[in-house]
Every structure is written in C-alpha cells, then in structure tokens.
C-alpha cells in the first residue's frame, strides 16, 4: 500500500440508499458534540477521540461482520513521542510509559516513515499514528499545489481518521479474515515512459461511474459508457488488467469502507474522488482508489452482500462486478468523449512533466542513466528492511526489472534515506551520486572480471569504502565496507556494497 497524503477532492452529498443492506442497519446513538480542534496535541487528541466515537457505530453499516469494531483502535502519539493515547469506541485513555512494551517502542521508532504503524498492544489490534506538524505542513503544501487553497485543520483530523479506517480494513478485515495479503501486492508499478491510452480508458470509465452516481436516472446510460471503456482496456491491455486486478479489489473496497464510515459521521467529508485535473492525472494504482465509486453503486443497487463474496474470492473487481450484466455497445461513438479525453491528456501532460516536483527527479534520473553518466552506490537490502515508504513506483520499460521509487523514505540495516528518488533492482537499492568524488575509497584493486547481479554489468575492481561525502539525502550506517565496482554497456558505474 502506497502511503500518500489523502487526496482532498470535491464534495458529493451522500445519497441515502434503499438497498437491503441498509434495512438491518443498527440504530446509531446520539452523536457527541465535537470539541474545538487546534494544533495543540491535547486538543487534537480530544477532537480525534470524539470523532472516532462518532464514526465507530457506522462500521457494521458499511460492511458485514468481518469488520469488527474492536479491531479498529488508534494509538495516537505527539511529535515528541513522549505521550500516548489509546482511542476507540470506549473513549480516550492515556497510556503511561510504564505500560509501553517492546512492540510499541519499535512502532514509535518507525511510525514517522509511513505515518502509521500496525501492532498488537495489550491484546488489541492497533493503528499507531503520530500528530506531526511536519506532516501537517506537507499536507497543506500538497493541497495548495493541487487546489490553490489551504486546508482546514479538520482535514488533518480527517486524514488520520481515513488512515485508521482504510488501513485497518486492510490489516484487520482483508488480511485477518483470509481475504488476500493486501500488503504483498506487486502490481502497483506504473510503467515509464507512461502510455496514456490505458490510463485514459480507465479514467473515462471512472468519469462515467461518477455521473451514474450523481444522476441516478441516467445510471443505465452511464453503465453502458463505462462498460465500453473498461472492456476496451481489458481487451487491449490484457496483462496490465490482470496484474492490477488485486489492487482494484483491495484498495477499492478499503477506500469505499473508510470514506463511508467517516462521511456518515461527518457529511462535509468527501465521499468520492472528484473530477479535478489532479484526480485525472494519477498513476495506475490511483485509479484503483478512484474506482471505489463502483462499490458505492453496487451498494446503491442492493448487491453488496453478493459482491462481498466475489471480492473475497478475488473473482471480480468492483467495476467488473457492477457491470457484469451490462452489454457492451457494438457501435459506440467515441467522439462523444472527446472533451473528457482532451481534459485527461492535458492533466497527464502536466503530471508527467518536469514542472511537477514529484516527477522532475524521475525524469532527471532516467535521463542521466540514458546518458551513461550515472554513478550508483548499491546496497543489498534483502532481509534488512526496517521500514520503507514511497510516493510512487515507476517500472522502467527500457530497463526491464528496474523500478524508480519516488520520494523514498527508508531505513535498512546498512543505510538510511530521507525522501529521495532511487532505483531498485530485485533486493538492491541504487543511490544516485552526483559523481565519484563523493566516495572515499582505499585499497583499490583490479580483480579478474566477474559477473555482477545486474544485467550487462561486470565487476573488474574492488575497494574499501570508508566514507560517503556531501550526501544529505542518505547516510551509511556501516562503514567501512567492501565494494566491488563495474560499469554497464552505457558507461554507468556501480559501486556495490558486499
């Protein structure tokens, strides 16, 4: 699961449903009055606790018995990580440090990487989160970049609620109830350079379903439109459609669940992704979240119980289940979608350009590699990962097996990196250096040429690495270390830690 600041999209008024899943909904108790929210940790924790008490009663309304209230517990700590509250349906309880165990202390040391951490604490499944003003500032910057507006502090609170319900759904409904191991999905990588056509087809299907939600009287018409585009996608891009299926199910259902639980308690919270440019320019797995609208429509159509069985058995994605009885049109006039296609293309042109601060380092790294001027310090991280989080994966079409990780924050046993873009190859992470002068090497020796783990790279030297200079974006934890050295057919240089 990718860890990104929650997309804050245009609001949609929640439509009450008359389907059978609603008829047996529990009576929701009177909602507590919300306290004032401020940046102060105590005030913020009090607000979150009241919000959780508002949201929890809706858990069973939007999913079946697999979603147990007792498995949705929040551990909230402050920026100094010296205060901790357990928050759930029972209220808010401070946990004194005398009760902190090894699992919790490990979580506290790692929570800043992804913003959350799962653990079992005092026989409860818990989601640990940190009230970090640095993360709040990052969220504000992203929204200002996307929408040009400053989000209210409540939206930071909503983000924490969304993390609690969405991510706990992965861990304590999907994984715990033997769905699929959601954390092991390997199909989320966006190919680079980006082929616009499959992205456009899926986004057109999303736009059709959004219109079906907004205008129920025209739902049948929009279902046909969505069926055409999703079938064209699945026919022309068979391999990609098969590989993204699991993520469509896993993220689509978790997004549906998390947004509904919060929106039911807070109607100003956006139920669905909007259709703004930044939502039309995302990567392949962004679409998996957006297509959660299909689960909303399944529920509105009264078929959620049946769909749950299909999702659990990984038989159908939300959009395929929704449209399984819809006939694809034989003669569809694609020109009617020309305006939407142009809008999507323009949004993607902006997204995948050097003007995007998250895309610029990817473009620069690939250009440097293509030129043969790259210098990599390479670390094997197999069985050494402490934590990792990234804001995007790009599989490099021109270099099969290589993946570009955007804004990676990671801790390995041998290296720590702080928000940089790197390459990965199997269990190896490749840190790009400005030049070789950053490496202090001793005992440089020629060796008999030998094969390396990397394609078209042969080792011909070895040395002892004693220091890495002027690199603020990552640091080596273990020095000195032995390295072997080689080049690829383009001239790029690889210093591989042994």
Model-predicted segments: where are they?
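Active-site scaffold of zinc-dependent metalloenzymes
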Residues: 93-157, 468, 488
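Bacterial Sec-dependent N-terminal signal peptides
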Residues: 7-35
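Non-catalytic terminal regions of proteins
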Residues: 43, 47, 310-498
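Active-site-proximal alpha-helical
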Residues: 238-334
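Active-site recognition of the HExxH zinc-binding catalytic motif
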Residues: 162-175
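Post-HExxH zinc-binding segment in Zn-dependent metallohydrolases
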Residues: 120, 175-240, 244-270
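Bacterial N-terminal signal peptides that target proteins for export
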Residues: 1-2
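N-terminal mature-domain "stem" immediately C-terminal to a signal peptide or N-terminal signal-anchor/transmembrane
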Residues: 28-101, 158
């Amino acid at each position: 699961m990718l860890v990104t600041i929650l997309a804050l999209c245009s609001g949609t008024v929640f439509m009450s449903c008359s389907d059978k899943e609603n008829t047996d909904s529990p009576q929701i108790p009177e909602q507590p009055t919300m306290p004032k929210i401020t940046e102060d940790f105590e005030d913020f924790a009090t607000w979150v606790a009241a919000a959780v008490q508002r949201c929890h009663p809706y858990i069973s309304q939007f999913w079946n018995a697999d979603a147990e209230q007792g498995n949705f517990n929040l551990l909230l700590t402050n920026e100094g990580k010296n205060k901790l509250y357990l928050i759930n349906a029972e209220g808010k309880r401070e946990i004194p440090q005398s009760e902190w165990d090894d699992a919790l202390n490990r979580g506290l040391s790692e929570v800043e990487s992804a913003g959350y951490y799962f653990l079992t604490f005092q026989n409860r499944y818990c989601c640990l989160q940190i009230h970090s003003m640095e993360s709040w500032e990052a969220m504000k910057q992203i929204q200002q970049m996307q929408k040009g507006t400053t989000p209210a502090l409540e939206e930071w609170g909503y983000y924490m609620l969304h993390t609690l319900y969405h991510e706990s759904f992965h861990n304590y409904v999907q994984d715990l109830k033997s769905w699929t191991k959601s954390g092991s999905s390997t199909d989320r990588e966006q190919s680079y350079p980006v082929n616009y056509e499959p992205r456009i087809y899926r986004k057109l299907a999303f736009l059709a379903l959004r219109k079906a939600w907004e205008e129920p009287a025209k739902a049948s018409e929009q279902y046909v439109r969505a069926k055409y585009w999703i079938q064209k996608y699945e026919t022309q891009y068979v391999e990609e459609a098969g590989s993204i299926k699991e993520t469509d199910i896993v993220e689509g259902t978790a997004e549906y669940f998390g947004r509904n639980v919060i929106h039911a308690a807070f109607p100003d919270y956006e139920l669905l992704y909007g259709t703004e440019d930044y939502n039309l320019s995302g990567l392949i797995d962004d679409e998996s979240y957006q297509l959660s609208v299909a689960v909303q429509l399944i529920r509105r159509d009264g078929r959620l119980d049946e769909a749950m069985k299909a999702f659990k058995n990984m038989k159908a994605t939300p959009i395929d289940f929704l449209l399984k009885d819809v006939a694809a049109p034989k003669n569809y006039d694609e020109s009617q979608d020309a305006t939407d296609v142009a809008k999507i293309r323009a949004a993607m042109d902006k997204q995948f350009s050097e003007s995007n601060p998250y895309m610029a380092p990817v473009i620069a790294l690939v250009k440097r590699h293509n030129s043969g001027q790259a210098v990599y310090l390479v670390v094997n991280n197999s069985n050494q990962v402490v934590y990792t989080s990234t804001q995007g994966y790009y599989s490099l079409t021109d270099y099969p097996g290589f993946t570009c990780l955007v804004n990676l924050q990671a801790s390995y046993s041998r290296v720590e990196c702080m928000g940089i873009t790197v390459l990965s190859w199997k269990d190896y992470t490749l840190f790009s250096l400005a030049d070789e002068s950053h490496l202090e090497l001793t005992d440089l020796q020629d060796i008999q040429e030998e094969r390396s783990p990397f394609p078209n790279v042969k080792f011909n030297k070895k040395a002892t690495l004693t220091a890495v200079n002027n690199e603020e974006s990552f640091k080596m934890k273990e020095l000195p270390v032995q390295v072997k050295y080689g080049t690829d057919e383009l001239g790029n240089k690889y210093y591989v830690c042994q």
